[in-house]
């Protein structure tokens, strides 16, 4: 039973306050399909997950699904934390200010201006990429954030 609680599809459905039957009806699929997805017997197709994200008002579900079912996606796109729009917005703005205040944008341009990243520049370039990855993660969190009162 604890394994069911960690199922991303079940968590999203329950957060919306829907029964399996109500969700199945809204999604136009069978109750048994919902059960199979939520117990891990079957992986829902992307089209069904897209409908779940809309029906459950859980945009982050689409990101979670892709990260869990597509290893290439998971290695490129950062995890999207489940947080409120206020938390996500504050984190995004803080990361942008930190990036600008550290003059990382200027350092990136200086490194890239000759179109070559040499061995001496590589550590700084990689550090800048990590900072940019944090900004991307924060922006995705804003996109998927829970709205106030939800």
PLM regions: where:
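A short, Lys/Arg-rich alpha-helix, primarily the initiator
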Residues: 1-15
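Short alpha-helical DNA-recognition segment
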Residues: 14-36
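DNA major-groove recognition helix of helix-turn-helix/homeodomain DNA-binding modules
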Residues: 47-65
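Short, charged recognition helix plus adjacent turn
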Residues: 64-95
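Acidic, glycine-anchored loop motifs typical of Ca2+
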Residues: 81-84, 102-124
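Charged, low-complexity intrinsically disordered regulatory/assembly segments
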Residues: 89-92, 112-150
């Amino acid at each position: 039973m604890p394994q069911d609680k960690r199922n991303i599809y079940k968590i999203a459905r329950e957060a919306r306050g829907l029964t399996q039957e109500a969700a199945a009806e809204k999604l136009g699929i069978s109750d048994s399909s919902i059960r199979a997805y939520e117990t891990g017997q079957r992986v829902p197709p992307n089209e069904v997950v897209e409908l779940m994200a809309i029906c459950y008002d859980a945009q982050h579900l689409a990101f979670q699904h892709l990260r869990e079912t597509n290893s290439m996606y998971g290695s490129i796109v950062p995890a999207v934390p489940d947080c409120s729009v206020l938390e996500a917005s504050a984190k995004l703005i803080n990361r942008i200010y930190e990036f600008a205040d550290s003059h990382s944008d200027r350092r990136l341009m200086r490194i890239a201006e000759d179109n070559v990243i040499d061995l001496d520049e590589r550590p700084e370039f990689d550090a800048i990429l990590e900072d940019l990855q944090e900004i991307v993660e924060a922006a995705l969190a804003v996109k998927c954030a829970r709205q106030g009162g939800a």
